[in-house]
Each structure stands twice: as structure tokens, then as C-alpha cells.
């Protein structure tokens, strides 16, 4: 399987530390009930709650202010929501130990990665293990991500679709895979680095001067509005995926807002803004993370008023405190479940595993199975 991974271009499969990103030395096993009741159903419920949050933000200036959405993004988000712009996908990160309800840690709403691994690699691993007789033929996996993407493309796009990202191997692999699913859906994908997109002042164009009608951009909305193109008139001539309304959800600032909307929800953790004493009492055990950060950067884990883990990074700005939900410990390995939605429907999971409480870019990806003896 590692040879296949290397051929697919996963140069980041082995980091400088020597840690293998794709790790098939172990796998996680779930019962059908655990998947259906504890992961799939809560994921759908949280996804619906997030749509309610967007509706609330569009209607109430105070919610926009609390979330801290940049002013230049607010009108884009409102217009996108009112148009009913379609969404492709997203990933909820959950803490789940098999005994209590899964807890939402955060929502990767705008630019989620580790998609190819979840949709393709672990499914290939499952087929290999069944073929080799290592796993019983009845073994399954919660994974309809690939087929769901193909069907969603048919709903939200037509004709030519451009795919753009930074010149980063992980981002490029994600974009190439999504372009492949779009092609299966009957669309005509065109991929390019995001820095090769041009602007005529009326339309965005690719490096062959073809107009960009629909753009899947693996590039955060808050960066787009800061770039030179953010204020361009061409913004109104292109359909974006993910749509601008997803920017409302692509911040950890939604965590205290969700808790305020649904206090006591079994799949939410109490959360507050770090600078707001009016929030819930977290009892001296919490995780502090910047509202806008990536790959587990600048996170501080506090237990019983003592710092037990910190991560480095360059992210600053407002932060949130979220009640500590210790990740389950399997011989020193701590998994986070990435629960994928396509459209608004739960369709599969991928698991990242590390040694600490914070998932970072060095956390390994492990496959999973569903098996009922």
C-alpha cells in the first residue's frame, strides 16, 4: 500500500521526523451501532445546527461581530447565502471513546484536507486486506465519500470547473482528486496554481485566458479578501466552491456561539471566548486555540489549571477556550475522528492519530473498519 501511496504523489507521507503519515500498522474497529448512532447521526445533527448558525449570523449583526468575520467578507457571505450557493464538502473533528457521545472539537468548513486518504487510501487498504484473507469478507467501512462527491458535483456544477490551490503537495493532491471526481460526474475540470489566476477587471481567467465560471479554491476565504483580487469586480462573475457563506463557519469562533445556541447539547463542548468572563465555567480544564489557525498551531491544553501541552505557531488574534475532552488513549496513541459531510450529509470518516491531545501536521492517518461478529 505504501508503494501505491508514493505513486499517488504523497511526498508528505514521511515527514522529516521519520514519522509515517499513512500508518497501516494498526486500524480502528467500530460496530455498526457506534457508527450509525454515535458518529453518523450526530454529524448530521451538528451540520444542521451549523446551517442554523449561518442563518442567525445573516440575520443578526451581533453574531457576525462575535464570529469576527471580516467586514469585506460579510456582504459576500450574505449574498452567497441568499443565492443558495451550493456546498461540496466539510469535515468535523470529533473526540470519541466508544463509551459516551462524540464531542465536536472543531469544524473544517472551508478548506478541509486529508480527503484522498479517507476516500481512497483506506478503502484500498480494506480491499487489500479482505483479498489477502487478513480481514473477513463481511468487513465494511464507513466510507461512501467518493461516490457522494461524484453525485454532489452533478447537483452543484456544470461544464468547466477550475481547481486551484497553493503550490503545496498535500493541497495539490486534494485538488487533483476532487478534479477526478468532477470528471467522473461529467464535468470538465481544469487545474492550476492559484497564483496563475488572472483578472481582466471583468472576469477571472486561467493561464490560457479561458474565463473561470466556477472555481474550486483550496484557499481560505479570509486570505482571498486580503489579496489583490478580493475587491475585484470579477468576484461577482465566478461561482466559488466552497461558497462565501462557508466563511461564517470556518473559524473556531463558532464553538462558543454553537454552545450558546444549544447549551447542554450532548455532542457539543462548553466553550467561551478567552476574553469573555461571561461564558460557561470550564473548571480549570480547557483547550485554548486561536479562532483562526490551522494544523493544530498555537494551541494550549490546560488540565486542573496546569498547562499540559502547547504547540508552536504564528497565529495570533482572538482565541476561544473549549472544555477539555481528553482523547482516548490506545497504548499512547490518541485518535481524532474526522467525520466527513458531502453536501450536508454524513458519508464517512478518517482517523488521525498522535501522541498528544492536539492533532498536528505530523499526526498519522490510520484506516478503520466496521465489523459485527
Question: What function would you assign to each model-found segment?
Answer:
Residues 1-373:
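Preference for protein termini
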Amino acid at each position: 500500500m505504501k508503494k501505491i501511496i508514493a505513486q499517488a504523489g504523497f511526498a508528505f507521507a514521511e515527514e522529516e521526523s521519520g514519522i509515517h503519515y499513512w500508518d497501516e500498522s494498526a486500524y480502528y474497529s467500530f460496530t455498526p451501532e457506534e457508527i450509525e448512532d454515535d458518529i453518523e447521526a450526530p454529524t448530521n445533527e451538528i451540520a444542521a445546527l451549523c446551517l442554523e448558525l449561518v442563518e442567525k449570523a445573516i440575520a443578526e449583526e451581533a453574531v457576525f461581530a462575535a464570529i469576527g468575520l471580516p467586514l469585506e467578507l460579510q456582504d459576500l457571505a450574505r449574498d452567497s447565502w441568499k443565492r443558495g450557493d451550493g456546498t461540496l464538502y466539510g469535515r468535523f473533528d470529533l473526540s470519541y471513546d466508544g463509551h459516551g457521545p462524540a464531542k465536536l472539537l472543531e469544524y473544517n468548513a472551508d478548506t478541509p484536507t486529508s480527503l484522498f486518504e479517507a476516500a481512497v487510501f483506506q478503502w484500498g487498504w480494506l480491499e487489500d486486506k479482505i483479498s489477502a484473507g487478513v480481514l473477513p469478507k463481511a468487513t465494511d467501512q464507513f466510507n461512501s465519500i467518493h461516490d457522494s462527491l461524484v453525485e454532489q458535483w452533478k447537483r452543484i456544477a456544470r461544464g468547466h470547473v477550475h481547481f486551484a490551490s497553493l503550490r503545496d503537495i498535500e493541497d495539490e493532491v486534494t485538488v487533483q482528486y476532487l478534479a477526478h471526481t468532477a470528471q467522473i460526474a461529467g464535468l470538465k475540470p481544469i487545474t492550476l496554481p492559484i497564483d496563475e489566476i488572472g483578472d481582466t477587471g471583468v472576469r477571472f481567467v486561467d493561464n490560457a485566458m479561458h474565463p473561470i465560471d466556477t472555481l474550486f479554491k483550496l484557499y481560505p476565504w479570509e486570505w482571498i479578501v486580503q489579496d489583490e483580487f478580493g475587491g475585484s469586480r470579477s468576484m461577482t462573475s465566478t461561482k466559488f466552491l466552497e461558497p462565501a457563506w462557508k466563511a461564517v463557519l470556518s473559524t473556531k469562533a463558532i464553538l462558543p456561539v454553537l454552545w450558546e445556541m444549544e447549551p447542554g447539547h450532548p455532542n457539543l463542548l462548553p466553550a467561551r471566548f478567552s476574553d469573555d468572563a461571561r461564558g460557561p465555567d470550564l473548571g480549570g480544564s480547557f483547550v485554548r486555540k486561536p479562532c483562526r489557525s490551522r494544523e493544530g498551531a498555537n494551541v494550549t491544553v490546560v488540565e486542573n489549571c496546569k498547562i499540559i501541552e502547547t504547540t508552536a505557531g504564528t497565529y495570533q488574534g482572538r482565541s476561544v477556550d473549549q472544555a477539555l475532552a481528553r482523547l482516548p488513549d490506545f497504548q499512547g496513541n490518541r485518535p481524532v475522528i474526522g467525520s466527513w459531510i458531502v453536501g450536508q450529509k454524513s458519508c464517512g470518516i478518517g482517523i488521525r492519530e498522535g501522541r498528544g491531545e492536539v492533532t498536528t501536521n505530523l499526526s498519522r492517518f490510520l484506516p478503520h473498519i466496521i465489523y459485527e461478529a
